[in-house]
Amino acid sequence: MLKNTILIGLFASNFLLFSCSEYEKAIFESVSLTENWTFQSENLEEALEADVPGNFTMDLMHHGLIKHPYIKAYASHLETGCEDVIYRCEFDFPGMHYPYQDLVFDGIDTYATVFLNGELLGKTDNMHRQYRFSIENLKEENNRLEVIISAPLNVLDSLVAASQFVLPEDFAHMRKAAFQFGWDWAPETPSLGIWRDVRIEGYEDFRLISSWVETQAIQDESAEMMLVVKLDVKTETELKLDFQSDDFYFVSQTVSLQAGEAVLHFPFTIESPELWYPNGMGNSFLYPAKLRMKTDNGMLEKQMNFGVRTIKLRRDKDSIGEIFEFVVNGIPVFAKGANYVPQDAFLVHENHEALLQSCVDANFNMLRVWGGGIYEDEQFYELCDSLGIMIWQDFMFACALYPGYNQFFDNVRQEVQYQTDRLRGHACLALWCGNNEVKNAWFDWGWQSVFNWSDADSVQIWKQNTFLFDTLIPDILSESGVASDYLPSSPVWGWGHDESLTEGDNHYWGVWWGEEPFEAYRKHTGRFMSEFGFQAWPTQKMLDYMHDGEVLEIESDIMIAHQRHPFGDRLIRETMQQYFYIPETAVAYGQMSQQVQAFGISEAIRWFRTQPKCSGSLYWQLNDCWPAISWSSIDYFGEWKALHYAVKDAYAPYMLYAVQVHNKLMGYVVSDAPENRDVMLSLEWFDDEGLLVFTETKRIRSEAYNHRSEFVLDVPQSLQSNTGWQLEMKLKTDNEILAKYTYSPKF
């Protein structure tokens, strides 16, 4: 199709705003189709009411046909991925009279055939894409929409059978959320459904595909901005476009459009801009603006909030290797956060507000949206914009090798284009990443020998995967002018490689998978720690829900069903014994598991923050998709585990730490607060009976954004002969305690 690119400039200046009343007719209308749905499978004699958006498994549960998969061990008995399901909706449709009408599905999971009034509209094969079908045979009454969704496991069997190669993970053959096929924190739930919004859209001369604002450059007193509007133009037309806030016209222009896809660029300048900053660095300010587009047939209006900021991933060479550091508005940032996974195994229950507020409350400034889940909805990213949570966005590829045929690549191409168009304008978006652990797996997991590939097959398999992540995806980003940086694979090096400590990001799993003690984090600190973690039980509230009246036991069928890691229970128990003790009751055992997790991971975070070479800490994982024994700091109910409280202190703007380094007790003061400040460090030494032995103070000038100071702590002579003493560290101003830390030589 014809692609028009238009560049028109205007300085933002004060004007009186025009009244919307001059545009009385809308040239776009959207009508929801999320009501009056039924579903029927081959095992159901009659159709039953369905939830849309929703999921087949949850529909069965709502009708009492299966037990809730999250209770007891019922998830082990699910068999909902093996039957086709028909979703039907009958609706009347009077009143929409536009020359162009589309039926739009924002998400179908996954392989579906769509009929409207008996006419085949098309098929779907990617749950990560929007599907749009042109419709012409709507009736005012008694329209019948049918979506026949194929059983995912049956489709998968046919795809695997047709594959040129035996690939390590079958799920790689389909564009469906990988975690639904089971992970070491998630149940096997390969279900199906219409999982996002469905609607009919009507429009006149054009359809707005997407619009966004990018920051081109920030100078001392101004910011150079770019409004980009992407249109599907149906007929040659003249378009009057206005982009404005309550105080400013940013853009006001008239352009002539030809039929085809048009990408319009409108540069503008904001004088004395208020900048967007991540949480803890300053205000996450968003300019509220409206985009209005008028033709002779009427007007379309869209609310657009945008931030003025630059975010770059700095990867310069240095004396150690290569820096891996995010820089926001010219200021280096230590990334503080975690890895985010889908909030529900069936993608039906999400509470973005509460979960993201918990991130802010724990002093996060970044989340990594992990590549085995989903691209989140608009509300998620809008909240991250307003809360100041930067997003490291994986594309949805994880822990697998992917097929290399053209149809698969074309499918991915459309997915990437859709998602980047949708998300690129968010102030929170810091990085696009091609995948999770694909490169790591290829070089370190031994798949070549496990699957007995020939040398020629190995070359071809790796070639098609490097094409996917090193060519296809970055080429789309480049051709589309995506400003955010791109990383082909995370981690850059696996945790067994020396390079993982000197360049790129690091998934350090020597602790846990390698069964190393927590102290190993101090020997294996990389430039950016993007995965590390340790498991614990969920909260008591979650345990009570899982057991549904049955007695909680340390080892039971229920607990085994909710522990997805092959040696997780053993490792929790052994580590508990190593650092603390093993309680006798199940309630105390669960609480102690949380204390172990909180101790180990918060100690690691504090250490990472003291190391000048390290620029980020994203622990595994923030949240759960179901009631689980897992690495999360917040359980499925949104309840904080002990780790989240510990992380709140470890990620605080001011942080203290003490640790034995080369036979010396070292003390650290770290701050990323956005202001210079004179503070006082108080050191109180207590003997093994809790008696105060010695007190000293140090005055420190804390520098804005990136302060680290370290010093030797001299243990009082009277305490050197035993290990029962404690050091209480406090960082204070005249009227405020900024940070605390307790050190004990026992640990």
Label each residue range with its predicted role.
Residues K123, L387, D394-F395, W620-P627:
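Active-site-proximal loop/short-helix segments
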Residues M1-A12, L17-M366, T610, E639, ...:
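Secreted/periplasmic carbohydrate-active enzymes, especially glycoside hydrolases
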Residues T110-A112, N154-V155, R314, P342-A345, ...:
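Flexible loop/turn segments at secondary-structure boundaries
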Residues G107, T124, D394-F395, V438, ...:
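Generic detector of well-ordered alpha-helical packing
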Residues V31-S32, S41-E45, F179, A186-G193, ...:
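Substrate-binding clefts and catalytic carboxylate motifs of secreted carbohydrate-active enzymes
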Residues G337, G371, Q393-F395, C433-N436, ...:
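Active-site proximal loops enriched in glycine and acidic residues that flank catalytic Cys/His/Asp
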Residues S76-D84, A345, W370, P583-A598:
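Short acidic-aromatic active-site loops that bind/stabilize oxyanions
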Residues R132-E136, I148, L153, F165-A172, ...:
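Active-site mouth of glycoside hydrolases
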